[in-house]
Each structure stands twice: as structure tokens, then as C-alpha cells.
UniProtKB/Swiss-Prot annotation:
It comes from Arabidopsis thaliana (Mouse-ear cress). The keyword Ribosomal protein applies. Belongs to the universal ribosomal protein uL15 family. Keywords: Ribonucleoprotein, Ribosomal protein. SUPFAM superfamilies: Ribosomal proteins L15p and L18e. PANTHER family: 60S RIBOSOMAL PROTEIN L27A, LARGE RIBOSOMAL SUBUNIT PROTEIN UL15. This is Large ribosomal subunit protein uL15z. The keyword ATP-binding does not apply. One of its GO terms (molecular function) is structural constituent of ribosome. GO terms for cellular component: cytosolic large ribosomal subunit. The lineage of its organism: Eukaryota, Viridiplantae, Streptophyta, Embryophyta, Tracheophyta. It comes from the Eukaryota.
Amino acid sequence: MTTSRKKTRNLREHVSVGHGRFGKHRKLPGSRGNAGVGMRYFHKLRNKFYCQIVNLDKLWSMVLGKGFLPENKPVVVKAKLVSNTDEKKIKEAGSAVVLTFLLY
């Protein structure tokens, strides 16, 4: 094809030469090593500052009724706080619950 019939000759004096004003015809970052890694790192940081609220006084001292106790070994559980389900399970297993309070 001769040069005079090529598309580039027809697009002379057109501002963006058929590649659009907004998107622009830019070189691809994919062939440039680690170029474009920034957005991947940005998505990693999305929940960087998210932190659930936890009551520190209940963190180590709250007993929840999620597990199970051995039936033949009685246990004495000492804690500041005990849930209703856990207290019920402990007493059914023949164990005891002792509520203790710490003064700060």
C-alpha cells in the first residue's frame, strides 16, 4: 500500500489521531517490569486501618460456652464474666463456676 492511502495520512490535523481525547494512546506498563505494581499494593492497603472494637476488660476474662467439658473430671472455672450457656454446660458436667473480680 502506498503511503498516500494509509490511515495516518487521513488522520493528519486531527487532534488525538483516532485514539480518543480522554483515554489517550499510552504505552502499556505491562512490558515494563514492575510498572503498574502500585495499584496492586493500593488494593492490599484497603483495610489497613480497619480494627474491630474489643472491650479490653472482657478480652481475657470472658468465658464462652463454645466447647465441651469432660464428664468424669470436675473442673473449677474462675473468671470475671461467664455466659449463660457456658455456666449451664459447666454445671451439667458436675463442675463449678467461681466469679472473681480484679481491682485495678
